[in-house]
């Protein structure tokens, strides 16, 4: 059984999506996958980003790709890992930029739940993965679903900040109305690309400056 319950404010916004043929196919695919493979995150955490940041609470969107595929890493929030799990390299680089940008101490835990509670929606474009197989659930329907999520956030809200790291995330800018929202693009924080412009991109201070300029409360980024 795949547990796909979603927080009530999101359920209301996405109700039509859950009835569509592609989503039924995606559910069938996940049921079959679960019989044969270990999947991450646990099915009860697939929609953890939605549970942690209700629709009306979203102020910032940080877009990831697919979940971490190592044991105990993924828990449904993009880039975040469970307490007690060493932060992966991309997250270490995010924390380095956090320190260099706004002076936060480097967090000891890689759990970003406190950001989610501050209105930072930590969305992966694909919400499940096979253990040890990156991108194994690519092009199975999740992208259609998360594109709709991004588009609906853009349409129904205003003055959001969308933080898009890396080319795949950057391509999602076409779903966002830049007259209503701030889009911040930079290279991915992965060690392969972080020195090509991720470091020094100042996403945290730029986000807070924008929110303050719109009369909104800045994010408490320090963990």
Swiss-Prot record:
Keyword Transcription regulation recorded: no
Top EC class of this enzyme: hydrolase
Protein name, entry field: Uracil-DNA glycosylase
Key words of the record: Cytoplasm, DNA damage, DNA repair, Hydrolase
Entries under SMART domains matching the protein: UDG, UreE_C
Biological processes per GO annotation: base-excision repair, AP site formation via deaminated base removal
A GO term, aspect molecular function: uracil DNA N-glycosylase activity
Gene name as annotated: ung
InterPro entries the UniProt entry points to: UDG_fam1, Ura-DNA_Glyclase_AS, Uracil-DNA_glycosylase-like, Uracil-DNA_glycosylase-like_sf
Pfam families xrefs: UDG
GO CC annotation: cytoplasm
Annotated family: Belongs to the uracil-DNA glycosylase (UDG) superfamily. UNG family.
Localisation: Cytoplasm
Disulfide bonds listed in the record: none
Role according to the record: Excises uracil residues from the DNA which can arise as a result of misincorporation of dUMP residues by DNA polymerase or due to deamination of cytosine.
Catalytic center residues: 66
Organism whose genome encodes this protein: Sulfurimonas denitrificans (strain ATCC 33889 / DSM 1251) (Thiomicrospira denitrificans (strain ATCC 33889 / DSM 1251))
HAMAP family recorded: UDG
Substrates-to-products reaction catalysed: Hydrolyzes single-stranded DNA or mismatched double-stranded DNA and polynucleotides, releasing free uracil
E.C. code: 3.2.2.27
């Amino acid at each position: 059984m795949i547990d796909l319950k979603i927080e009530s404010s999101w359920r209301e916004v996405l109700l039509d999506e859950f009835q569509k043929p592609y989503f039924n196919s995606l559910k069938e695919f996940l049921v079959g996958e679960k019989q044969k493979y270990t999947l991450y995150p646990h099915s009860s955490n697939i929609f953890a980003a939605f549970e942690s940041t209700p629709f009306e609470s979203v102020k910032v969107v940080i877009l990831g790709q697919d979940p971490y595929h190592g044991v105990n890493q993924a828990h449904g929030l993009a880039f975040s890992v469970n307490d007690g799990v060493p932060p992966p390299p991309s997250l270490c680089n995010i924390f380095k930029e956090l320190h260099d940008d706004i002076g936060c101490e480097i967090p000891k835990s890689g759990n970003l739940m406190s950001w989610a509670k501050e209105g930072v929606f930590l969305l992966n474009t694909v919400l499940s993965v096979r253990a040890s197989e990156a991108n194994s659930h690519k092009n199975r329907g999740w992208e259609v679903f998360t594109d709709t999520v991004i588009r609906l956030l853009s349409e129904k809200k205003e003055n959001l900040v969308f933080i898009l790291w890396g080319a795949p995330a950057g391509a999602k800018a076409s779903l966002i109305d830049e007259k209503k929202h701030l889009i911040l693009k930079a290279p991915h924080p992965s060690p392969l690309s972080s020195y090509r412009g991720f470091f020094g991109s100042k996403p945290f201070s730029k986000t807070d400056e924008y929110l303050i300029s719109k009369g909104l409360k800045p994010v408490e980024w320090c963990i």
